């Protein structure tokens, strides 16, 4: 992210982060939340398949104080979408709209 900023990026994103991994405090996942002040503005993008987990993950992400919290509704990778997350969430619009992190906080 720092390299992107040095070469002129106005904003950078983290890799997308699994809401389930955030809830379990997986070290590799938690490390993605580390933000260097030189990276700002920076967005942290999360993905998940159910609302309670996404809300809990969003609370964890907020502690990292990103400039933007983004919800991934577009990843088509089978490992993600096949479990109902990312683009898989688009198969269940009522559930997607129930997600306060993605549908009401714009």
What are the residue ranges of the model-derived segments?
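Flavin-dependent oxidoreductase catalytic cores
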Residues: 1-106
């Amino acid at each position: 992210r720092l390299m992107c900023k040095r070469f002129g990026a106005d904003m950078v994103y983290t890799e997308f982060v699994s809401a389930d991994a955030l809830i379990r405090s997986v070290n590799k996942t938690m490390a993605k939340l580390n933000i260097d002040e030189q990276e700002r503005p920076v967005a942290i993008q999360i993905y998940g398949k159910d609302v309670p987990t996404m809300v809990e993950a969003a609370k964890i992400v907020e502690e990292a104080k990103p400039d933007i919290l983004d919800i991934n509704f577009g990843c088509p990778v089978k490992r993600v979408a096949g479990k109902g997350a990312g683009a898989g969430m688009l198969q269940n619009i009522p559930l997607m709209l129930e997600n306060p992190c993605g549908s009401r906080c714009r």
